[in-house]
Amino acid sequence: MNLQILFEEQTKLLNKINLEKKRYLYEKINWNLKSIGILGQRGLGKTTMMLQYIKENFSQTNNALYISLDNPYMQSLSLFEFAKEFEQLGGEVLFVDEVHKYENWSTHIKNIYDALTLRVVFSGSSILQISQQNSDLSRRSIIYTLENLSFREYLELCDIYKFDSFCLEDILKNHQSIATDITKHIKPLMHFKEYLQ
């Protein structure tokens, strides 16, 4: 296996990654856990979040590696053996994207968890396929779900305005003052039409 090629591909991806704008889930993930799953629909930013974490924490080292299992090269390898070799070469964290495209992926993740000290962060967009895997990851992995972009998050990511988030109870109690504050800063209906497109 030629890790150098994979690190070169990772460097190209990291060069395109912006660290200034992050999805809400980024700060909620405990990145120090041994096994983390990030689930969500396609195009929500799972890959970007993983690459942001690598860029922010490992950009000057080869201790973290991003791989995508929709890569034909990765399809031809044993994920467990790949992870084992990466760990032997000093790897600390393996980021595995598109896990649902790899047959028996959950067995490999389970074996990595049980046999190696390597941490693994995996993501996938086919929640149905992921939930149908038969290996018991529930005791080994913490699963986070990346939801669709909220209107509040859209406003922040587009640099329109950054509003605090509120729980439902606060909204029900203080809806008038919250609405008044919002309309002081933006015209919500104008931006909401853009958000829906």
Q: Where on the chain are the PLM-derived regions?
A:
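Short glycine-rich substrate-engagement loop in P-loop NTPases that contacts/grips substrate
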Residues: T61-V93
